[in-house]
Each structure stands twice: as C-alpha cells, then as structure tokens.
C-alpha cells in the first residue's frame, strides 16, 4: 500500500495479543494493518518459548507457545488483514487531519487510529552474574529453551525462582534425565498451583543458594553453589544449565512515540486510551491499577481498545454485537 492509503486501525506488535487485536478488528470489518518488528509473528511466546506450556489461556487445559501462535495465525487470516513483518516503527506523527503517519524501517504508513501491542519491548536476558566462558552459551549454558529435545536424557540445572523457572523445571522433568532447581531464596515466587506441582515432582530443589562459579568439567559443567547466610558450598555436575533470571527490557521506542509511561509501561485509561488521543495500548505494554501481565488479560483488553477506536471514528455507528452474531 502507498502512503496515501489510510488504514482505519494499525496494530503495532505481532505477539498473541496483537494478533488477536487484528483479528477482532477484522471481526468489526475494520481496515487493518498489523506491523511486527521480528521476521515472524508470535512475539516472545512463539519465538523464544515455542515449547513452553501455558495453563492460563481460556479454552485450553494446556497449550504450548507454538500451538497457541498457530491457532492465532489461523484465526487471524480469516479476515485477510495486511501484515508486515520485519517492520520497526520508529516514530508516529499526527497529521493535520488528525490521523497518523507511522514512520517505519519499511516506509511510511497512514492510519486513523493506532493500537500498541508491543509487550515488554525489546528484551535481553539477565545474565548470570559470574564470569564464565561465553562459548558455553547455546551449548551448555542457555537463557532460552527453543527445543525441549536439546535437553533429552541430560542432567539439567535450572536457576531462578519465578514462574518461568518453575515452569521450565516442570516441563523438563519428563524429558531430562534429572532436573535440579536453584533459587537464592527459601520460597518461590510462582503461581501456587505451579509451586504445588513442583513440590510433588522429582525435581531436586536447591535453596537457598547462589551460583558462585560455572566451569567446564570434561563434557559437563561444574556449578559451585554458596548457601545464602550459611557455610555450605556444594557442587552440582550437570550437562546443561538454564538461567531464568528474567529480562532487561528496552522501551526507548515509547519515548520516540511520545507516550506517557510509568515504570511499568504505557499509561492508559479504562478504554485503553493513551496520552495521545487516537493511540491505544494493550497487553504487557500497558500500566494501570490492577494490571496483570497475562496473555489472557491482553485478550480482554483488545476488544475494549478496538471498539473504542471505532467509536471514535464512527460515533453514530452501532457498536459491537456478541461475536456469535458477527462471525460466520
């Protein structure tokens, strides 16, 4: 499309929440553009954690990241939205007519409204805070799991105390020869059901310990631990070490887009409206009282933002009916 074409809604971000937002906009018969900075749709869920099992998605007792993304892609294409990957939005200007020009790495696009669904922004994993040979990364030491088979029949240690660390320890349990979970505190920060499952599992819990050193030993890793407020210094010998210390996010693009933020994300009101009228935000990108960083929450925010955007464009148009009345 040329710069002269004006989309009704442009969704920035092709993760699960962005894909669902683009689908729902199609359900409302809107002219939609979906922009994604990565080469593939799916966000962190599809690109970093394809084998991670999700338990908090409505309608799925459990579903892997890659299977959820596959289902969302199937849903998305029903209304044939315009989708552009490998497209980074650099700035968003408001034009004299009140609409927006999005300046991107692949040219300019015009849109009447914008929905930001960029998740946590660009991200890098928090690294292990001890010196180690960088050549170990991707061979013996990992920050992401892209294929569970990499860990099959291996002695595996997982480091971390949040939901991701617990989830990966449980996911690896039936695949690996044995799994140990290392955490610096006595208690874990995960969901109660996950912690209960961990306690019933065969995973060896190593708490409260810090990792003091990681050194190659023959074809394995020797992980020296240090007890927090104690004297014990055991050593674990494993085939692979998975670090789950969270991520450092880069949200510089939010400043370039001139959106008001706090330490948690983009500030929005109850209609998901940002500080710039006509630009909305949903999913893990946003901040409001009571916000939960769940895909399920983002799925609920998407229709709110889309319907408000269309109400802004067409105040006299009948608003959304139940989806069963719309989708055939």
From Swiss-Prot:
Q: What is its EC number?
A: 1.18.1.2
Q: Which reaction does it catalyse?
A: 2 reduced [2Fe-2S]-[ferredoxin] + NADP(+) + H(+) = 2 oxidized [2Fe-2S]-[ferredoxin] + NADPH
Q: What GO MF annotations does this protein's record show?
A: ferredoxin-NADP+ reductase activity; flavin adenine dinucleotide binding; NADP binding
Which cofactor(s) does the record list? FAD
Which residue windows are coiled coil?
none
Q: How is the cofactor bound?
A: Binds 1 FAD per subunit.
Q: What class of enzyme is it?
A: oxidoreductase
Keywords of the record, alphabetical order, are: FAD, Flavoprotein, NADP, Oxidoreductase
Say which family it is in. Answer: Belongs to the ferredoxin--NADP reductase type 2 family.
Instruction: Look up the domain of life of the source.
Output: Bacteria
On assembly, the entry states:
Homodimer.
For FAD, which residues are the binding ones?
36, 44, 49, 89, 123, 284, 324
The family database entries (InterPro entries) matched by this protein are listed as: FAD/NAD-bd_sf (IPR036188), FAD/NAD-binding_dom (IPR023753), Fd--NADP_Rdtase_type_2 (IPR022890), Ferredoxin-NADP_redctase_2 (IPR050097)
Designated name of the protein: Ferredoxin--NADP reductase
Species assigned in the record: Lacticaseibacillus casei (strain BL23)
């Amino acid at each position: 499309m040329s710069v002269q074409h004006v989309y009704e809604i442009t969704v920035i971000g092709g993760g699960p929440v962005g894909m669902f937002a683009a689908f729902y906009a199609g359900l409302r018969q809107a002219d939609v553009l979906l922009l994604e900075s990565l080469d593939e749709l799916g966000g962190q869920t599809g690109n970093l954690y394809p084998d991670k099992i999700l338990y908090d998605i409505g309608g799925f007792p459990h579903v892997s990241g890659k299977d959820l993304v596959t289902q969302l892609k199937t849903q998305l294409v029903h209304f044939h939205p315009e989708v552009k990957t490998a497209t980074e939005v650099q700035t968003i200007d408001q034009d004299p007519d009140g609409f927006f020009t999005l300046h991107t790495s692949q040219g300019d696009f015009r849109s009447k409204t914008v929905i930001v669904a960029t998740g946590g922004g660009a991200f890098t994993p928090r690294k292990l805070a001890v010196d180690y040979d960088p050549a170990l990364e991707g061979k013996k030491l990992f920050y992401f799991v892209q294929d569970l088979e990499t860990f099959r029949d291996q002695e595996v240690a997982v480091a971390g105390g949040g939901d991701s660390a617990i989830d990966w320890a449980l996911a690896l349990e039936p695949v690996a020869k044995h799994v140990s979970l290392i955490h610096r505190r006595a208690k874990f920060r995960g969901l109660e059901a996950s912690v209960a499952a961990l306690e019933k599992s065969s995973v060896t819990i190593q708490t409260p310990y810090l990792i003091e050193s990681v050194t190659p030993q023959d074809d394995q890793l020797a992980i020296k631990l240090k007890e927090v407020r104690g004297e014990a210094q055991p050593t674990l010998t494993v085939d692979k070490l998975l670090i789950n210390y969270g991520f450092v996010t880069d949200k510089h693009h939010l400043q370039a887009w001139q959106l008001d933020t706090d330490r948690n994300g983009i500030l929005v009101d109850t209609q998901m409206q940002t500080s710039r009228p006509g630009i909305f935000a949903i999913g893990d990108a946003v901040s409001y009282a009571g916000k939960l960083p769940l895909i399920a929450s983002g799925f609920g925010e998407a229709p709110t933002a889309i319907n408000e955007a269309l109400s802004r464009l067409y105040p006299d148009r009948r608003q959304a009916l139940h989806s069963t009345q719309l989708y055939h």
